[in-house]
Amino acid sequence: MKKIVTFLFILMIILLAATVLLHVRSCGEDLFQKTDITEKLPPIDDSLKIRIDTFLYNNFPQGSIGIELYDITADKEVYSYNKDSLMIPASCMKLLTCVTALRYIGAEKLIHNRLYTSGDIMGDTLNGNVILKTQYDTAFNRDTLNNLVNELKNKGVTYIKGNVIVDMMLTEPLDHEEHWIIGDLRTRYMGLNLQGLPRMKKEMLGALQAKGIKIIDGTITIGKLNPRNATLIADNTATLHTLVEKSLKVSSNINAETLLMPLGYIYDKKGNYRENGKKVLQNFIRNEMNINPTTVCNIDDGCGLCINDKLTADFLVKLLVYSAKRPRIYNEIINGMPLSGVDGTLYKRMHDSRLKGKLRGKTGTLTRNGGVSTLAGYFIGKDNHLIAYAILNNGWYVETSREWQDKLCLKAFMPQRIMGELKDTTHIIQE
């Protein structure tokens, strides 16, 4: 009898354990099902792909084309055509330069133009040197220089018994790259500090003479600031934000190319800043985006003037997605980009009320190689989703390509309803 009772007791324990195990397993399966991330992602707009396909079927362009759209909100590609082909990006190359500069330097970085003295001021005579130290402020002009020198005059200095030392980041003029066309870089818009030492020496002498200051027992020469033996008397500042905004909004080649200098300085303080800056762009792609740069780009400059520059539509979109996940970068990029039909290089385009103010885009234009027209940026799609897009037209007339892009954006990108305007940064996607 005792054996039967013992057997029944053991059997009950086994059945109870089995029941508990099945319950736990069931709960576990339910738990994993509920935490499946794919179920939490909002659906994409399937009609967007249909609209683009329909538009391309009826309006397929000449030349070569690369297109990609990515729903950042849903974290999913919406559409692509020829997205992995290397194509000439023109000024869309500036997106890579600006994002890299914002990542490694920051929009708030101050750019200094400073005037120092060494030695003592006795009456109206400075017994020592004046040192002008400039960085990469593209807006450094005669007014800036005169304001700095005026502070020397305010100290009561009429005579400099010593040298005027110019400490410049770039002693040679910011010149054309090998594959640019002469005139592409509009030197009349350059800062004085980018026009080389001879020009700076001439302007410095003129600024001193305008204030009635004379150099005795000395000359204007190149040299390096020794901060331990110098006193700061004047400081004019700009920010990296200004360079980024001008590069994007009005597509300034000088500002974009100048951004390579501080990047190159980070890479090697004694090397060629522009060449080293291009190496930093490649390192950014490799280290920050985890992409092999040789598969998605060829970088010959920082502004996109060179026809040897190459990017893929897929890379441009990945760059935009990278930016959207980083608020400090995204704020600068989204606000720096022209707004359709409103400002910048899109001021004269996309005036249809269904498109005006609805899209942000960096434009790119080259008249060489049969024509290059590119457009990449953001718009708000169905259900308030943030969409990143890239369109690259190569080998087709520029004006015709622009008209085609505008129609694509209007008839395919825009849903049937009028979309919300993309004027602010409320659609930041947190990383």
Question: Over which residues does each language-model region extend?
Answer:
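N-terminal Sec-pathway targeting helices
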Residues: 1-13, 19-21
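Active-site SXXK
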Residues: 75, 89-108, 164, 203-205, ...
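A small/polar active-site loop signature that marks catalytic segments
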Residues: 159-160, 170, 182-336
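Active-site-adjacent, His/Asp/Glu-enriched structural segments that form or flank metal-binding
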Residues: 110-169, 180-184
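Small-residue-rich helix-loop
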Residues: 54-57, 78-80, 264-431
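Soluble periplasmic/extracytoplasmic beta-strand elements of cell-envelope proteins
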Residues: 66-70, 80, 97, 129-133, ...
